[in-house]
């Protein structure tokens, strides 16, 4: 193993994932990005940023615990950035169970894998303004209470609090 930091980015083909991969590559990281098996992933953002050839793309599915564990075990990343999600609010109303399984339980699967493989792996969980939902004060800040109004918002709020719980419980 080299001293190069390794990062795993779920959702690397999205806007945030693409720009994060570019930043980490510029900082000298070895970057792994995930794509769902069988999905017709669009790599246009990664191509536009001229980083696709420098990213190790891995088949990955937040629904499959064993796949998550094997991926983390084989890469042994120093950092994991969980940007993947079923993020379309209207779809979350049509498919609330799938949305929750991907966003909420998918996060738990990653957290539990980190706990069993290497508790020193740093973990970032992406959030969304949808977690605030119905707000009384604008703008929101760290004191604004969550009041999600969609299955998507609820699932991301669950992921947020699960991340806090794991950090506080398994420090």
Q: Model-derived features: where do they sit?
A:
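N-terminal Rossmann-like NAD(P)+-binding domain of SDR-like oxidoreductases, especially those catalyzing
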Residues: 1-171
């Amino acid at each position: 193993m080299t001293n190069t930091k390794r990062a795993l980015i779920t959702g690397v083909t999205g806007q945030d994932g693409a720009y994060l991969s570019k930043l980490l590559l510029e900082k000298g990281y070895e970057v792994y990005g995930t794509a769902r098996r069988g999905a017709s992933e669009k790599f246009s953002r990664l191509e536009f940023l001229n980083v696709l050839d420098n990213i190790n793309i891995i088949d990955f599915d937040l629904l499959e615990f064993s796949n998550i564990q094997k991926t983390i075990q084989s890469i042994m990343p120093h950092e994991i950035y969980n940007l993947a999600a079923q993020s379309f609010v209207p779809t979350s109303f049509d498919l609330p169970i799938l949305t929750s399984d991907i966003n909420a339980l998918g996060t738990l699967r990653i957290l539990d894998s980190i706990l069993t493989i290497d508790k020193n792996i740093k973990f970032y969980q992406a959030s969304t303004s949808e977690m605030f939902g119905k707000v009384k004060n604008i703008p929101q800040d760290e004191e604004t209470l969550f009041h999600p109004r969609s299955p998507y918002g609820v699932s991301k709020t669950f992921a947020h609090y699960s991340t806090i719980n794991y950090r506080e419980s398994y420090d």
